[in-house]
Structures are given as C-alpha cells and as structure tokens.
Amino acid sequence: MKVGFIVILGFLIHSDELIDWGVIGHRTVGQVAAQHISKKTQIAMEDLLGGASLAYISTYADEIKSDDQYKAYNPWHYVNMELDENYDSSKKNSKGDIIHAIGKCIKVLKSKTASKKDNKFYLKLLIHFIGDLHQPLH
C-alpha cells in the first residue's frame, strides 16, 4: 500500500513535467524544423531573428508568459474542446486559442505593411505555437 501511494504521489508531484513540452521539447521541435526548411526561408528567418536558431527561439512564447505586458497571449498556447467535437464546431475562447494564434501569426508575416519588429515577434510566437500544437494534451 505504501509503495502505491509513493508512486502516485511521485506522479502528482511531477505531473506538470509529464504533460509539458518544456524547454527540451520545444528546442527539439525547433531543431527538427530547422532541418526541413528551404535555404531561402532559412536566410530570411536568420535575418529576422538576428541569427538565433529556431531551437533557441522556440521557447520565447513561454518565456514571456509571466510578463504582464504579454498576458493577453496566454490563451494562444492551447485550445479546449469536448472530446466528441472538432475545432470548427467547438465553442471558441473569445480571447483566442492556438488555431487563432497561428492564423494571426501567418497573417502578420504575409502582410506587406507589418514592421520588422512585428514580423520578428509573430515569427517567434509561430515557432513556439507549432511546437505546442504537436504536444498531446496541450
């Protein structure tokens, strides 16, 4: 009985680590992604990101979450819906979700009028959210 309790307690204590990508997960996704982009895209991204790697940038959106200036972006890390629903039929969060966020990031990056600062910010978010999207239970 004691062993079972200790095992369950261990899982509960570390449960956030079990369902959370964390730095290593995001950086792994960033590194893998970097190996699959065209040279043209790589050059454009390096210019925009000041030479920082996709792996390094991939954690940016989590790093800014606790800053009050960026709190509005917190719901963009995930989407909630019932198990028997698909995204189109699910109730949407009025503050946005990861699907909305990816669309917004792409829209800014495609815009001819977006500033370099905005392009850099939304590219960093996009890199992170693609990693979040591929994490089960996120």
Please describe what each predicted stretch is.
Residues E17-F129, P136:
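N-terminal, motif-rich segments that launch catalysis or mediate targeting to/interaction with membranes
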